[in-house]
Amino acid sequence: MNAVITFLEKRVDIAKLNALEVFGRAGDWHTTVYANRVKSLQVWEIDKKWKNILKKNLPNAKIKILDSIKTIVENLEPSKFDLIVIDNPMTTFGTKKEPNLYCEHFDFIKNIGNIIDKEAIIIFNINKNPFNYDEFPEWKKRREKFYGRKRTSKLSPRFLIKFYKKLFLKNGYKTVFQKLFRREEHLDYFVFFLRKN
């Protein structure tokens, strides 16, 4: 995340951005890299067990315990954000009743326009080459449906950039610039600066 923020600081005034961290968990991984550089920070986390830890790790942030996906899909958040970081799980997830309710960032990112005004920077994780992929048939099925491809175990950066540009454009936002940053062996940060058409 350090490289991502350094890249962004050369292009935008980070200190003027109202940021949102989605799937906050403890807030002790990459969130601390940018938390004190932005104008404001709101963190969304579904599990209340993380609330006090989040408050400790991110004392200046506004912590909200809620279902992030339900909140954006149903347009329940009145605030708009300029920097949105989606640190989603890399599989399907949900409730005990519906464990495969959501998948990666898919359900969230399709509704990103609900929390953006005129422009925003979106940072999200992409698993280009999932490992043990065949052991998770529901995850595989959801990826195939979202990306519109039969094989999603190896997605090229070229395909992914084109796919997300088209997805954002369909939602009324053009891509001003984008960049990929390696996070881990199979995981990259995708950074998109979006502007309303």
Question: Which positions does each model-derived feature cover?
Answer:
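Conserved SAM/SAH-binding beta-strand->alpha-helix loop
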Residues: D47-K49
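A short acidic, Gly/Pro-enriched loop at the edge of an enzyme's catalytic core
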Residues: V73-N88
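Conserved class I S-adenosyl-L-methionine
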Residues: A15-A26, I123-G148
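Short alpha-helix
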Residues: S153-N171
